[in-house]
Every structure is written in C-alpha cells, then in structure tokens.
Amino acid sequence: MGYSRDVPPIDWPGLEMVGITRLTDDIYYGWLDHEPNPMFWHWCAALADVPDDRLVSGCWVAAGTSAHTLVARDPLHLEPSLLWSCCGVHGWARDGKWINA
C-alpha cells in the first residue's frame, strides 16, 4: 500500500494526531491527545528505493519528542534539535519554523 507524500499517516491506532502542521515539504508535526509534546513526521529520501512491501508508512518516519522541552506551543519552539538518524536530517523547530542545522 502506497502512502502519499502530501500528508503523513496521522491515523495510526493509538497515535491519532490533530492539528497537523507542515514545517517543510518533508517535515510535519501534530499533537496526540495524551502527550504534551508534538509528534513529528519526516518524509525520508533514504527510503526511496526500499520496496513498498518492506515499508510501514511509505517513506514517512515518525519521531516522538517526549524527551524534549516544549518552550512554546504557538508558535512552536522545541529544544533541543531533532535528528533523524535514517538520513541525517537535523534541525530545530523554533518560532513555528524549521531551521536546518
């Protein structure tokens, strides 16, 4: 089953998100009812050649932020930076924007 790059999979059982917000073409975040910090999704280019039957959500990779400090919810400011080890995407969510490292 293919997944659209237009929007991350926000309806996983137990991980239903609200308030999905696009930071870049490849990075989104949203809110879980039971968590004070946002959940992030990244469309990982490193997974582009992986067969669909080996992927759970297309090239979308989730990142929880429970170990991060939520400085502000609106505009979003989260510390420290986020790093996706799958491909090395690294940066900060500050003032409601994504800032590359």
What are these regions (language model features)?
Residues 45:
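Short, Lys/Arg-enriched phosphate-binding patches
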Residues 1-41, 49-101:
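A short Gly-Trp-Pro
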